[in-house]
Curated annotation (Swiss-Prot):
Organism name: Saccharomyces cerevisiae (strain JAY291) (Baker's yeast)
Cellular component terms per the entry's GO annotation: mitochondrion
GO annotation, biological process: mitochondria-nucleus signaling pathway; mRNA processing; RNA splicing
Gene: CCM1
Lineage: Eukaryota, Fungi, Dikarya, Ascomycota, Saccharomycotina
Designated name of the protein: Mitochondrial 15S rRNA processing factor CCM1
PROSITE patterns in alphabetical order: PPR
C-alpha cells in the first residue's frame, strides 16, 4: 500500500487549484511507474529462488487504484466552484491536453504571488457564500453584518449555536422588519433551535415587531419555533417543581396570546371586516413541548393544565407521543399506578394511540422498579404478538427486570436462579440478533450483565465487567482529551467512575458465598461468555502494568479468585476508597496527625468568623452546612458517594457476619442529625460566649447539647477541638435516614447485639423529632415507622423475648396495619411453646386491624 503525505511546507511553489491537479496527477503517474519498475527490478533480483513475478493482474489492480484516486480528485474539484484566471466558472475538469502535460514549470513559477493569493481567496470566498446561502437567508446575513459570527457558530451543524446570531439581530437596526413573514417563519421553525431563554425572548419580541403587533398574523410556524426552544430548556436547580417557573409562565403567556388572536379573529368576522387569509392553529408538537418541559419540572399541576387546556379549548387530545411523555413522567415520579392506567388507556383508545416500542420499554423500566417479572414477561409477549420490533434496550430491560426480581426469594417465588438464567438468555438472544446499538446501549448492556452477576454473587465476573468497562471508558476519555491528561486526572476520573457500576460491584461482594456456583457455569454458551470476560480481564490486568502511555490501575487484589471473607472485605474497602477519592487523585479518607491539626486550626478560625457574622443560630447553622457541602464537593467524588451505594457497602460486613467491620464503616461514613445539631449549638454558644441554660451532666454523652464558655480548662479545649474535628469529618459522611436506621437494626438482628438494638431505637426516636423526618409525607412516615417496628419484633423474637415483641404490636395496633407475614416468625415461636393466649391476642390484632384507624391516630398525634 502506498500513501501520499499532504500538508503545507515551506519553500514550495504554489499553483492554482486546477494546475495543481494536473501536475500532481503527472507526478503520481511518474512515481507510480517508477515504483512498479523499481519493484519489478527488486523482484527479479531478489526472488529468483521464489519464482515470483508481477503479473498483469497486479498491474491492472494498481492502475485501478490510481484511476479511483483520480476520479475521486476530479469529483472534489467538480463540486468546488473554482474561479479561473479569466473570471469564468467551470463546473467540470477539462481534458488534459498534450500541451498541458508539457507545461514549463519555470514559467509558472514567475506568476506574481498576488494573483495566486487572489485565486485562492476567491475560491474560499465563493465556497463560503455557497455554504452560507444554505444556512441563512441573504437578508438575515446582511442584517447580521458579521460573517465571522455566522461562520463561527453555524458552520458546524452538529454544534450550531444560534444565540449569538439572534442576539446580534436584536441589536441591529431593522431586525426582522420588511421580511416576508410566511417564508421566513417556515425557515425559522426548521432551523433555529436550542436557544437560551433570553434569546427566546429576543426572538419573540422581533417576531411581534415584524407583524406590527398584530397577534392574528403570528402564525403556526412562529408558535412552534418558540415552543420548541422553550421545551428544550432545562429547569434551574432551585426550581425543580415548576413553581412560578419563567418558562412555564412564558408558555402560558403564548397560549393567552393565541386565545386573544382567536377572539380578535371572531370579532373581525362578526363585524364583516374580512376573514384572515390563514388563522394560526395549535398543534400536537406544541402540546408535546409543553408536556416535555412540565415533566422536566416534575410539575403534575402544569402537565394537567396543558392537557386540559389543549383538550377543552383547542380540541387536541394527547397522541401517542404525548401519552408516552406522560408515562415517562409517572415513571420518574414513582407514580406506577397512574402509569399503568395511562398505558392501558393507550391500548384501548385506537390503533393510532397503541403503544410503540418506546412506550413498552418505559413500562419494562417500571417493572424493574416494582420487581414485577410476570408482568414484564406478559409485556414481552405482547410485543411479539403485535409484531412490534424489539430494540436493544428491550432485551436489556428484560434482563434487568429478571435480575432485580431474583434479589428476593419471595418475589422470585423461590426461583431466583431460574430468573437469572432467563435474563442471560435474553442477552444471548440480543447478541444473536445483532441489533443496532446506540452509544448508551453499551452502558446499559454492561449494567444488565453487572446486575445479573451481582445478584448471583459471581464476584469473578463482576470484577471483570467492572474493570473492563471502567478501563474502556477511561482510555477513551484520555484518547480524546484535549487538555493535559496528567494535570486533568481529577476531571477525567470524575467522568469515568459510575455510581451504578460501583453499587453492583459492592452488591456482588455482599452476596459472596464460596459454596455457590454461578448460573453461567451451567450451560455451554454461558461458560464461553464467562470465560471470554475473565480472559480479557486477566490480559488487561497484565497489559495495563506495562502501558506507559495511559497509566490505568484499579486496586483489585492480584488474585483471580477471591476465596475468603478477609479478601472480600479488603478489596471492597480498597475499591470504595478509590472511588470516593476520585481515582486516587484526592487524599480525603486518610490524614496524618499534622494534617488533622492543620484542618482543626483552619476551620476553628472559619467557624469563629461564621459565629461573629451570623445574626442568630439559624444563620450560623446555615453557613456551617454550606461550608460542609462545599468541602465535600472539593474532597469527595459526590457522584458515587450516595445513600444507595453506602447502603450496599455497609451491608457487606453484615452478610459476612463481621460486626467490628460494620461498626467501623458505620461510624466513619455516617452521622446523625441530632448529634450534628448538638455540636453546632455547642460551637455557636462557645464562640458567642453565651451562658448555657443547662448544666453539664457528668454522665451525659458527648453528643448532648451543652454550652461552652471560654475554654479555660483542658477539658473544654479538648471538647472544642473534638467538635471542630467532627465538623471537618463530615466531608466523608452521609446523614442517617430511616433506611440506614433499618439497616442498623438488621445488623443488630444478625449479630444478636442487644446494646446496638437499644442504641438504634433511641437514635431513631431522636431522628423522628428532626426536620428531615417531619418534612416527609405522612403516609411515608407511617410506613417507615411500621417497618422499623416490624424489625424490632423480629429482633425480640430471635432473642426469645416474646412478651416484648407482643408489647410492641399491641402498643402500635392503632397505628399500623399488622399483617400475618410481618408476625409469621413470632406466631411460629409462640406455637412451639404452646402459648395459646398470646397466639390468640396476636391473631386478633392481625385480623381486626384497619389502616384507616392508623391514619386517624396519626392525625390525632400531630394535632397534640
Amino acid at each position: 500500500m502506498y500513501m501520499a503525505r499532504c500538508g503545507p511546507k515551506n519553500n514550495v511553489l504554489c499553483f492554482p487549484f486546477q494546475l495543481s491537479f494536473l501536475f500532481s496527477k503527472r507526478l503520481i503517474n511518474k512515481r507510480f511507474k517508477y515504483t512498479l519498475q523499481t519493484e519489478d527490478e527488486k523482484d527479479m533480483m531478489g526472488s529468483l529462488s521464489k519464482n515470483k513475478i508481477i503479473t498483469p493482474e497486479d498491474v491492472e489492480f494498481k492502475l485501478a487504484q490510481l484511476r479511483e484516486f483520480s476520479n475521486t480528485l476530479k469529483e472534489r474539484i467538480h463540486n468546488t466552484k473554482s474561479v479561473n484566471s479569466d473570471g469564468h466558472q467551470s463546473n467540470s475538469i477539462a481534458p488534459i491536453s498534450e500541451d498541458s502535460r508539457n507545461v514549463n514549470v519555470t514559467k509558472i513559477s514567475s506568476v506574481p504571488n498576488e494573483e495566486k493569493s487572489k485565486n485562492l481567496s476567491d475560491l474560499i470566498h465563493s465556497s463560503f457564500l455557497e455554504k452560507m446561502d444554505h444556512l441563512v437567508p441573504k437578508v438575515i446575513r446582511e442584517r447580521v453584518a458579521d460573517d465571522d459570527i455566522l461562520a463561527k457558530n453555524l458552520f458546524d451543524r452538529s454544534h450550531s449555536n444560534w444565540a449569538p446570531v439572534i442576539d446580534r439581530l436584536y441589536v441591529s437596526e431593522k431586525r426582522f422588519m420588511d421580511i416576508d413573514s410566511r417564508e421566513f417563519s417556515v425557515w425559522l421553525n426548521g432551523t433555529v433551535k436550542y436557544l437560551p431563554f433570553h434569546s427566546i425572548l429576543h426572538l419573540d419580541e422581533m417576531l411581534l415587531e415584524q407583524i406590527n403587533g398584530d397577534v392574528v398574523k403570528f402564525n403556526t410556524h412562529m408558535y412552534e419555533c418558540i415552543f420548541n426552544n422553550l421545551g428544550n430548556l432545562k429547569p434551574t436547580n432551585f426550581n425543580q417543581d415548576g413553581t412560578n417557573d419563567k418558562v412555564i409562565l412564558k408558555m402560558k403567556e403564548l397560549l393567552e396570546r393565541y386565545d386573544k388572536a382567536l377572539k380578535i379573529t371572531e370579532e373581525r368576522i362578526n363585524k364583516k371586516e374580512g376573514f384572515p387569509s390563514k388563522v394560526p392553529k395549535m398543534t400536537q408538537a406544541i402540546l408535546n413541548n409543553c408536556l416535555k418541559y412540565s415533566t422536566k419540572c416534575s410539575s403534575f399541576h402544569d402537565m394537567d393544565y396543558f392537557i386540559t387546556k389543549f383538550r377543552d379549548d383547542y380540541g387536541i387530545t394527547p397522541n401517542k407521543q404525548n401519552l408516552t411523555t406522560v408515562i415517562q413522567f409517572y415513571s420518574r415520579k414513582e407514580m406506577t399506578k397512574q402509569a399503568w392506567n395511562t398505558f392501558d388507556t393507550m391500548k384501548f383508545l385506537s390503533t393510532k394511540h397503541f403503544p410503540d416500542i418506546c412506550t413498552y420499554n418505559t413500562m419494562l423500566r417500571i417493572c424493574e422498579k416494582e420487581r414485577n417479572f410476570p408482568k414484564a414477561l406478559d409485556l414481552f409477549q405482547e410485543i411479539q404478538d403485535h409484531n412490534i420490533k424489539p430494540t436493544t434496550n428491550t432485551y436489556i430491560m428484560m434482563a434487568r427486570v429478571l435480575a432485580s426480581s431474583s434479589s428476593n426469594a419471595v418475589v422470585s417465588e423461590g426461583k431466583s436462579d431460574s430468573l437469572r438464567l432467563l435474563g442471560w438468555k435474553y442477552l444471548h438472544e440480543l447478541e444473536d440478533k445483532n441489533l443496532y446499538r446506540h452509544k448508551k446501549d453499551d452502558l446499559n448492556l454492561f449494567l444488565a450483565m453487572m446486575a445479573l452477576a451481582a445478584f448471583d454473587g459471581d464476584i469473578e465476573l463482576s470484577r471483570a465487567l467492572y474493570y473492563l468497562f471502567i478501563a474502556k471508558k477511561y482510555k477513551t476519555l484520555c484518547a480524546n482529551w484535549k487538555g493535559n491528561i496528567l494535570v486533568d486526572q481529577d476531571t477525567i476520573w470524575k467522568s469515568t467512575l459510575m455510581p451504578e457500576m460501583l453499587n453492583y460491584l459492592m452488591l456482588a461482594y455482599a452476596r459472596f458465598d464460596p459454596r455457590n456456583l454461578p448460573v453461567l457455569s451451567g450451560y455451554e454458551k454461558g461458560i464461553e461468555l464467562r470465560r471470554k470476560f475473565l480472559r480479557e480481564f486477566d490480559s488487561s490486568m497484565r497489559l495495563d502494568d506495562t502501558d506507559k502511555l495511559v497509566k490505568f490501575k484499579l486496586p483489585f487484589l492480584p488474585i483471580s479468585d477471591l476465596n475468603s471473607e478477609a479478601q472480600v472485605l479488603a478489596e471492597s474497602n480498597a475499591i470504595w476508597s478509590f472511588n470516593l477519592e476520585n481515582g486516587g487523585t484526592r487524599n480525603t479518607l486518610t490524614s496524618s496527625n499534622e494534617a488533622a491539626l492543620e484542618d482543626i486550626k483552619k476551620y476553628r478560625q472559619l467557624l469563629d468568623s461564621f459565629a461573629q457574622e451570623a445574626e442568630d443560630f439559624n444563620e450560623f447553622k446555615f453557613k456551617v452546612m454550606y461550608e460542609v457541602t462545599k468541602m465535600q464537593r472539593e474532597s469527595i467524588n459526590v457522584n458515587v458517594f450516595n445513600k444507595i451505594s453506602l447502603h450496599t457497602y455497609l451491608s457487606i460486613p453484615i452478610n459476612l457476619k463481621q460486626q467490628k467491620e460494620f461498626l467501623r464503616r458505620l461510624t466513619f461514613f455516617t452521622f446523625q442529625q441530632h448529634e450534628f445539631e448538638a455540636v453546632i449549638k455547642r460551637l455557636y454558644e462557645g464562640y458567642r460566649n453565651i451562658p448555657s441554660s443547662h448544666t453539664r451532666d457528668q454522665n451525659s454523652i458527648s453528643t448532648e447539647a451543652i454550652s461552652v464558655s471560654k475554654p479555660e480548662t483542658t477539658e473544654d479545649l479538648n471538647l472544642i477541638m473534638h467538635d471542630i474535628w467532627y465538623i471537618t469529618c463530615l466531608r466523608h459522611k452521609i446523614m442517617m435516614d430511616t433506611t440506614l436506621y433499618e439497616l442498623v437494626m438488621k445488623a443488630a438482628i444478625e449479630f444478636q447485639n442487644e446494646d446496638l438494638a437499644k442504641k438504634v431505637w433511641n437514635d431513631r426516636g431522636k431522628f423522628r423529632t428532626t426536620v428531615p423526618f417531619l418534612k416527609m409525607d405522612q403516609r411515608i412516615r407511617i410506613a417507615k415507622d411500621q417497618k422499623f417496628a416490624h424489625l424490632m419484633v423480629e429482633f425480640f423474637t430471635k432473642q426469645g423475648k416474646y412478651s416484648d415483641a407482643i408489647a410492641i404490636i399491641l402498643s402500635s395496633k392503632n397505628r399500623f396495619n399488622w399483617t400475618y407475614s410481618m408476625v409469621r416468625n413470632l406466631h411460629k415461636a409462640l406455637e412451639e411453646i404452646e402459648d395459646r393466649n398470646s397466639v390468640e391476642i396476636l391473631l386478633d390484632v392481625v385480623n381486626k386491624k384497619s389502616h384507616a384507624k392508623a391514619l386517624k391516630w396519626e392525625e390525632q398525634e400531630l394535632n397534640m
